[in-house]
Design a protein with these regions (language model features):
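Interfacial loop at the N-terminal end of multi-pass membrane proteins
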Residues: 5, 14-61, 105-127, 162-165
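Mid-bilayer segments of alpha-helical transmembrane spans in multi-pass integral membrane proteins
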Residues: 93-101
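Intrinsically disordered terminal tails
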Residues: 157-179
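Hydrophobic residues within the alpha-helical transmembrane core of Major Facilitator Superfamily
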Residues: 15, 67, 93, 145-148
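Interfacial segments of alpha-helical transmembrane regions
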Residues: 2-15, 71-94
Length: 179
């Protein structure tokens, strides 16, 4: 796989993850703490059913592609780009950790609730979900920014100095010395 293809696929996966996070935060996350129990349960159960499997696949695939981006950029000698890609990968891993450590356990509890069986602290748990969703939303956006930045930096020369490259133009001569 070429480095640019890996970067393209990685960015697309990061954007898909961040897009779902951002859309949820923008449309629901900022107001869901004011939902009554019936609305919270109905919306929550629909979202869990629609997103659980899709997001598991997207987040894991995004992290794997992020690892590929870092490895390919390191191999190409672009340390700055690799560092930015690594930052993006670590941010995306942070999204996965928050999801698995906080959000999924809460989702698994919410899936079992009915209006009759809501725990006494359901509002606090709802608020906890919203807070951690905000955290992972902005981690995912930062991951996208880092991955995009990695594609925008120049390729390193052998000394590690970042250099800008322009495409070769017709009529350009190779000025490298022989020997």
């Amino acid at each position: 796989m070429t480095t640019k293809l890996a970067q393209f696929l990685g960015i697309m996966l990061y954007v898909l993850v961040a897009g779902v996070m951002w859309g949820t935060w923008l449309s629901l996350g900022r107001t869901m703490t004011r939902y009554d129990a019936a609305t919270f349960l109905a919306d929550g159960k629909h979202m869990i059913a629609n997103l659980a499997v899709v997001m598991a696949v997207l987040m894991i695939t995004a992290c794997l592609m992020g690892f590929a981006m870092v490895a390919l950029l390191l191999r190409s000698g672009s340390r700055l780009a690799a560092g930015l890609a690594l930052a993006g990968l670590l941010l995306m891993v942070g999204v996965l950790v928050v999801t698995l450590a906080v959000e999924v356990p809460l989702d698994n509890r919410i899936k079992t609730w009915t209006l009759a069986t809501l725990p006494a602290d359901w509002q606090g748990l709802r608020e906890r979900w919203a807070i951690f969703h905000t955290v992972r939303t902005f981690l995912s956006l930062a991951a996208v920014a880092a991955a995009v930045a990695a594609t925008l930096v120049g390729r390193s020369d052998r000394t590690g100095t970042e250099v800008a490259h322009r495409p070769a133009l017709a009529g350009d001569r190779d000025t490298r010395s022989i020997g």
